[in-house]
Every structure is written in structure tokens, then in C-alpha cells.
Amino acid sequence: MYSSNSEIKKKVTFILAAAGQGKRMNLNSPKQFLDYRGEPLFYSSLKLAFENKNINDIIIITNKENLNFMVKYCQNKNLFSKVKYIVEGGSERQYSIYNAIKKIKDTDIVIIQDAARPFLKDKYIEESLKILNDDCDGAIIGVKCKDTIKIIDENGIVLETPNRDNLIMVHTPQTFKFEILKKAHQMAEEKNILATDDASLVEMISGKIKIIYGDYDNIKITVQEDLKFLK
């Protein structure tokens, strides 16, 4: 339970997105199940969420073929005091998150975290919760672009070079007021919209989102070259 400066306690639900297929990795199993310090990669974020005093409930999303494994894993780790649901993922990340949202009956704030992003820090959660208020519907972690970005056409011809000072590379966690997030996903379902992150959907319903500057080491394990960060 999170208490803001007004001392109003808010219930916080943490969604761990662990249903990715990891196609770009060319591995025998999804990247979130890679070994990291003797545990599956997803456990790094799951453990932090379980131990964070501000988080009340946890929902884990995983692939259909890994549902039984995830249940047994959480049983062995005694995590079901906080883990309320283990949900089957959809064909796209957005559909997976919506599957989890539909399980939530009573909460105020939702935190969404990629299971393949193992370097989650408590400070990201604390800072995100602090800035959610009447004027802010969501908080997302990100870092400034260090490289110049080019916009190209389908033939690889450069069309434009945006000012990188205005560009942010977005990470997770992404934190939202629950009702706003739910409304955004409902809108996406009704209009058949598919976005690459939850913040994009909240933006589409005019939600106000603030950036919290994170760290460059908060990477998502996505391609083979990223495996060196796990050593």
C-alpha cells in the first residue's frame, strides 16, 4: 500500500510481462527464462516487486506452455501471498497486458514491467508513485538518446533527422492510474489499435504522462549481443 503526501493509501498492482516469445534471440526457450545468477531472468524483477512494501498484488503473464512451470515456481518460492494471478499471454504484448488488466478488480495504480528487463530498481517504483497525482496519469522510465536518429522510408532513404534533445528511449517500469490504463486498453480493443507500449495507448486518450530519467543499464534482453550484460 502506497501513502502519498496526503496520507491517502493507494493500492498498487504490479504486472510482470513474461509472455514474450524471444524470436529475435534464436534460443530454445523464451529469453525471460534464461539463467541469471542461478534463477530464471524474470525472477530478478519478480523478487524486487515481492519485497517492495508499496506493492500489494502481483500478476504474472506467461506463455501457455509455461503456465504450469510458473505456478510451481511461485509455489516453491512462497510467492502466492502477493502473486494473485498467473495469466496466459496473448498473441501480442498489448493483448497480454489487457488479459492481466481484466483480472484486476480493485486497485488504484498499476505498474507494468518487462520480465526481460532484469535491472529494475526500487527507486524507479518510488519515484513513479510519487509523481502520480491529479495532474499526472502516468510515469514512465526513460533515457535520453545518445545517438543521432534518422527517419527513413521503406527503401532506406533518409527522410528526416529529428532533434535528439527531444527524443527519449523508453523503458519499463511504466506506472499508471488504473482507471486511465483500463480505459486506454478498452479504447484500443474497440478501435483495433495496436501499440508498442502502454504509454502510447494512454496518450491516445489524452492522458498526461511524465518521464522519469532512468539509467542506461536498464536494458531489455532482446538480441544475442545483450547476453553479455547477464555475465
Curated annotation (Swiss-Prot):
InterPro entries: IspD (IPR001228), IspD/TarI (IPR034683), IspD/TarI_cytidylyltransf_bact (IPR050088), Nucleotide-diphossugar_trans (IPR029044)
Keyword terms of this UniProt record: Isoprene biosynthesis, Nucleotidyltransferase, Transferase
Residues flagged as site, Positions MEP for the nucleophilic attack: R164, K220
Enzyme class (EC, first level): transferase
Site (Transition state stabilizer): R24, K31
The UniProt record lists the keyword Transferase: yes
Protein name: 2-C-methyl-D-erythritol 4-phosphate cytidylyltransferase
HAMAP family reported in the protein's UniProt record: IspD (MF_00108)
Reactions this protein catalyses: 2-C-methyl-D-erythritol 4-phosphate + CTP + H(+) = 4-CDP-2-C-methyl-D-erythritol + diphosphate
Species this chain originates from: Fusobacterium nucleatum subsp. nucleatum (strain ATCC 25586 / DSM 15643 / BCRC 10681 / CIP 101130 / JCM 8532 / KCTC 2640 / LMG 13131 / VPI 4355)
Family affiliation: Belongs to the IspD/TarI cytidylyltransferase family. IspD subfamily.
GO biological process, one term: isopentenyl diphosphate biosynthetic process, methylerythritol 4-phosphate pathway
